[in-house]
């Protein structure tokens, strides 16, 4: 194989004479294509990595850059800073615990909600999930976790928490997602805390 590539340069673009060809490196060669941090590669065709080696992941405890696949956005409220809940008047009322802002893209959103109640609080139902509307549960039951304790309710006298299903969101512009907690109860008080996390998939 030749040790050089014959090409012409126009306006900073390198073009080979045969535009239908393939750039091939030696099978046992030690030379790699290096791209500096100030440069980028734009591909308009499909990327086909090795089926076994694939795309190498990070080898240390760092984070993906904003806008890159793997980016994580998260927000949490600890039990000591839990927000107060009021007895729900409707099926989809709730309380915003915290929120995150996601830029355009394809995301997986997941998290958990915790309910903290006083010793005498009597619960008949609780729920948690995400929504794009503040202080409102999502009307899609499959995107939330809900519990019903019957007409008699129960008095847990403790803190309990639960995860809600991972939800894919594909958005064309920056959107706020709220972590919502809900409780239907009588007597005494209840508060909600939790975490909402999103990871960019595309």
Residue ranges and their predicted role:
Residues 86-96, 110-174, 180-192, 199-202:
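Terminal beta-strand-rich extracellular "head" domains
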Residues 61-98:
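Solvent-exposed, flexible loop/coil segments flanking beta-strands in beta-rich domains
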Residues 13-17, 98-103:
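Short secondary-structure boundary/capping segments within folded domains
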């Amino acid at each position: 194989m030749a040790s050089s590539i014959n090409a012409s340069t126009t306006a900073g673009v390198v073009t080979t004479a045969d535009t239908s060809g393939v750039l091939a490196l030696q099978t046992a060669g030690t030379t790699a294509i290096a791209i500096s941090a100030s440069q980028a590669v734009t591909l308009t065709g499909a990327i086909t990595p090795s089926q076994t080696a694939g795309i190498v992941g990070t080898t240390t405890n760092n984070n993906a850059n904003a806008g890159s696949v793997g980016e994580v956005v998260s927000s949490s409220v600890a039990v000591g800073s839990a927000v107060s809940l009021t007895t729900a008047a409707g099926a989809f009322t709730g309380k915003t615990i915290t929120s995150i802002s996601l830029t355009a893209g394809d995301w997986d959103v997941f998290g958990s909600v915790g309910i903290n109640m006083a010793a005498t609080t009597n619960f008949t139902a609780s729920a948690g999930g995400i929504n794009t509307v503040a202080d409102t549960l999502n009307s899609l039951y499959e995107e939330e976790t809900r519990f019903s304790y019957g007409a008699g309710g129960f008095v847990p006298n403790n803190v309990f928490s639960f995860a809600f299903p991972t939800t894919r969101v594909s958005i064309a512009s920056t959107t706020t997602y709220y972590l919502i907690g809900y409780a239907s109860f009588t007597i005494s008080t209840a508060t909600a805390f939790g975490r909402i996390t999103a990871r960019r998939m595309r």
